[in-house]
Amino acid sequence: MWNGFWRYRYLLWNLVSRDFKLKYRRSVLGVVWSVLNPLLMCLVYWAVFSSLMDMRGSGIDNFAVFLMCGQLLFNFFNEATSTGMSSVLGAAPLLKKVYIPKYIFPLEKCCFAMVNCVFSFVALALVMVFTGSPLHWTILEVLYPLVTLFFFSLGVGLFLAAATVFFRD
């Protein structure tokens, strides 16, 4: 199984870089959108939850950072599974012409979602600096849950991609 991943690593790299270029090709701000989008969403959620629902007195220190962490992980899971779900159907013309393992396409979408998530962590760092949250070496502990979420999202994406071939709704 690992031999198959290693054999198609260049194809995977080319597919991820193609998606990256296609996403930001016609955009004026380019990659800045990957940072700006989570920042603006966090600002809206923070305004709603802190003022309208009075979450300031809930005992959560640095509520904006707390909110941003959850938002980034959810956005990654959402993007990885929703794009992975339709990836095999989207690659059907290529799959009919050349033999490529079908798992490459959901894996590529999950890798691309991880690239976007890494850019979004810049937004988290900006929120941490703005709110005065301390940066500790323990921030490296986020790597294990992120890798676990990657594989979980990949599994869900593979399952949904297989189901979408039969049930296109």
Residue ranges and their predicted role:
Residues M1-R168:
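Hydrophobic transmembrane alpha-helices and immediately adjacent juxtamembrane helices
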